[in-house]
Amino acid sequence: MEYLHITKMLSSSLSPQNGTWSDAISLLLALGIALYLGYYWACVPQRPRLVAGPQFLAFLEQHCPVTVETFYPTLWCFEGRLQTIFRVLLQSQPVIPYRSEVLQTPDGGQFLLDWAEQPYSSHCPDPTTQPIVLLLPGISGSSQEPYILHLVDQALKDGYRAVVFNNRGCRGEELLTHRAYCASNTEDLETVVKHIKHRYSRAPLLAVGISFGGILVLNYLARTGKAGGLVAGLTMSACWDSFETVDSLETPLNSLLFNQPLTAGLCRLVARNRKSIEKVLDVDFAIKARTIRQLDERYTSVAFGYKDCAAYYHASSPRTKVDAICTPVLCLNAADDPFSPVQALPLQAAQKSPYVALLITARGGHIGFLEGLLPWQHCYMNRVLHQYARAVFQHSVGLPGLGALTPEDGKS
């Protein structure tokens, strides 16, 4: 009966005898909005799925309520690709006064660390023990990315010292060797952690990796075991399986929106450093790549000594290394992430691991996680960092393994 009533109203409104079409358009618009809102409230807001071993699960439920609370994605852009795109287009850029430091690497390369700190923190008046948040941006990102600026801003507000590890060449500096960076090679990250721990040996250190940076954090933890020098790790939108990632990015729409623009940016980095790279490979051939897979085949796998792209992807995928991780790490992923498909997440391995927890939201895209009607400022990622950092810095005794050793301790 309700359906017949609505049909009669529409027919009556659309009838020429009843005057203009404006009433019909208004009715259709109202009906469309009602259906949209009904769908949103019925299907979109959901509690995230938290997968972890018993001790880590209890720790997170007690100290990080965001892990069990309903996530409300932005009403007008909750689809994964829209979340990914609008995060880039809409988010503000906090002004962060960085202090840059150049680090030299054992192989003759260089990269930049960008430090951010408050002159005095009421949370931690002793600067030698002030907690440090180490941030690792995405594949072509730097300390200037809006999502990094917001996370740094959050860390500073919470009273921590923040430092951003910029991969080689990502802040415009020249490559001194043919190698830029790759997801399987954690040598530069090891250099960073040792440098920080040497300077601030008494300060607890939390590594936060976003996207590509998250892969580095996971591979670093798997490689170093209990000697990683971190109290904990946090990853956001990390890609767990490189094969699944490139397959997803090569679907038509994802290729147009993400794969091609990202590849073009990476090719510019290679072309800009032709002088150093052309000694070991054909730069002209490499920069003709139109996909991430092609560039990895022509440049990354060659520069880092892999037989081919498949060998590199096998080495770079953290999915198979969960058992080797011995430092607590919380991993935030969205089920609709176009870069990291949900089927790539190591659910069973995380459930058995004492140290790895997966926090999976139904929506959020890739480095999106926008929430609220006006998502210009902080988002879900900031809330996760705020609560998790506070938990690991203030309640580390409750973490699995009771914290981590320093790199120096691991050698003894």
From Swiss-Prot:
UniProt-annotated glycosylation sites, renumbered to this chain:
N18
Give the UniProt record's GO annotations in the biological process aspect: medium-chain fatty acid biosynthetic process; medium-chain fatty acid catabolic process
Topology within the bilayer: Single-pass type II membrane protein
Q: Name one GO molecular function term.
A: acetylesterase activity
Give the EC number. 3.1.1.-
Q: What GO CC annotations are associated with the protein?
A: membrane
Supply the alphabetized keyword list: Glycoprotein, Hydrolase, Membrane, Serine esterase, Signal-anchor, Transmembrane, Transmembrane helix
Record field: transmembrane: 24-44
Give the location in the cell.
Membrane
Chief localization: membrane
Q: Which Pfam families match?
A: Abhydrolase_1 (PF00561)
Query: Which residues of this protein are catalytic?
Result: S211, D337, H366
Q: Give every AB hydrolase-1 domain span.
A: 131-372
Provide the family line: Belongs to the AB hydrolase superfamily. AB hydrolase 4 family.
Q: What is the name listed in the Swiss-Prot or TrEMBL entry for this protein?
A: Protein ABHD1
Species annotation: Rattus norvegicus
